[in-house]
């Protein structure tokens, strides 16, 4: 009889433990006004849109523990979708602007650069979509991991963070490679233009010099020699002017490339800092959950032991 009573008590306590009281999710208040980072206020429109996307994620991460489950609500998903669409729209416009600047470059080079920029744009969109889908999976993953050990929970969390960091670093490295290809293509087009100008004007200058020498040797008239020399000087001045304009254009392209490189490096550093902050925030989310699970399990064990001990105590007899 005591054994049956102990088994019934254990089953009853286990059933009570299985019915975990659900936490009432408070409603999100009005979304605060978001601003792009100060460093991106003077950047390209697509950079400002991407800054608003990351600012929104940072705001979501600063929510209190009582509203963490609201991260998966339809409102957050809709906001992220709108910011992603805005970023991709501005990025397409910036890509069209770059293609117009590459008009002096050869058709083959321009097509290659356009294809590579389009691939980088697709990878950026895929990574942003992965961030949104990963937020949507957190609730189901937490519910699935409630019955697992602490070590397995921490291992899965660390694995997710490592994958996110590697992906961000890989995207930054790929953007730097695309920038190097763009710089090489611009320099190649400018140098090709200078060479073509030299090839066209070189024979004219030589022809002018030869004609001036012929006229000077055949005619002894001083005015004719002066006119020939003046004509040669005008051709030389024209060639130098064209060469100077080409060099100025090349310097301008180099300056633009350096500005883009500096912006990408700054964004890479910001993305690394955001990844580290995101990792620390996730750890602070999951550690209280693990500690609460341990306390509940310890309380359940103590209740079962107390119940078994109470049922095992012999009842004193009235007969002496």
Swiss-Prot record:
Location of the region described as Specificity for association with VLDL in the Swiss-Prot/TrEMBL record: 281-293
Signal peptide: 1-18
Positions of region (Lipid-binding and lipoprotein association): 212-293
Compartment list: Secreted; Secreted, Extracellular space; Secreted, Extracellular space, Extracellular matrix; Extracellular vesicle
Gene Ontology MF terms: cholesterol transfer activity; heparan sulfate proteoglycan binding; heparin binding; identical protein binding; low-density lipoprotein particle receptor binding; phosphatidylcholine-sterol O-acyltransferase activator activity; phospholipid binding
Sequence ranges of the Sequence repeats: 82-103, 104-125, 126-147, 148-169, 170-191, 192-213, 214-236, 237-258
PTM comment, free text: APOE exists as multiple glycosylated and sialylated glycoforms within cells and in plasma. The extent of glycosylation and sialylation are tissue and context specific.
Record PTM Methionine sulfoxide, positions in chain: 145
Record-linked InterPro entries: ApoA_E, Apolipoprotein_A1/A4/E
Segments for region (8 X 22 AA approximate tandem repeats): 82-199
Binding-site list for heparin: 164-167, 232-239
Stretches the record annotates as Homooligomerization: 269-320
Residues modified to Phosphoserine: 149
Subunit structure: Homotetramer. May interact with ABCA1; functionally associated with ABCA1 in the biogenesis of HDLs. May interact with APP/A4 amyloid-beta peptide; the interaction is extremely stable in vitro but its physiological significance is unclear. May interact with MAPT. May interact with MAP2. In the cerebrospinal fluid, interacts with secreted SORL1. Interacts with PMEL; this allows the loading of PMEL luminal fragment on ILVs to induce fibril nucleation.
UniProt protein name: Apolipoprotein E
An individual GO BP term: melanosome organization
Similarity annotation: Belongs to the apolipoprotein A1/A4/E family.
């Amino acid at each position: 009889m005591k054994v049956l009573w102990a088994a019934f008590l254990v089953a009853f306590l286990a059933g009570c433990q299985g019915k975990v009281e659900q936490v009432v999710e408070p409603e999100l208040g009005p979304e605060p006004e978001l601003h792009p980072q100060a460093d991106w206020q003077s950047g390209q429109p697509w950079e400002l849109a991407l800054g608003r996307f990351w600012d929104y994620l940072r705001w979501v991460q600063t929510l209190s523990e009582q509203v963490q489950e609201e991260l998966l609500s339809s409102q957050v998903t809709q906001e992220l979708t709108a910011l992603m669409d805005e970023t991709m729209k501005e990025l397409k416009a910036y890509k069209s602007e770059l293609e117009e600047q590459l008009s002096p470059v050869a058709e083959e080079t321009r097509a290659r650069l356009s294809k590579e920029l389009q691939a980088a744009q697709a990878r950026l969109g895929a990574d942003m979509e992965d961030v949104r889908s990963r937020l949507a999976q957190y609730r189901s993953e937490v519910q699935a991991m409630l019955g697992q050990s602490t070590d397995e929970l921490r291992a899965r969390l660390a694995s997710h963070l490592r994958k996110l960091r590697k992906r961000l670093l890989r995207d930054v490295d790929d953007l730097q490679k695309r920038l190097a290809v763009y710089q090489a293509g611009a320099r190649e087009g400018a140098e090709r233009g200078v060479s073509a100008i030299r090839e066209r004007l070189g024979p004219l200058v030589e022809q002018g010099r030869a004609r001036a020498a012929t006229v000077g040797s055949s005619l002894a008239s001083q005015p004719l020699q002066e006119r020939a020399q003046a004509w040669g000087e005008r051709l030389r001045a024209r060639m130098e002017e064209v060469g100077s304009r080409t060099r100025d254009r090349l310097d301008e392209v180099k300056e633009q490339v350096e500005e883009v490189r500096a912006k990408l490096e700054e964004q890479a550093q910001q993305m690394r800092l955001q990844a580290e902050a995101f990792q620390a925030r996730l750890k602070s989310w999951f550690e209280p959950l693990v500690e609460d699970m341990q306390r509940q399990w310890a309380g359940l064990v103590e209740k079962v032991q107390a119940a078994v001990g109470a049922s095992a105590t012999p009842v004193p007899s009235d007969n002496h």
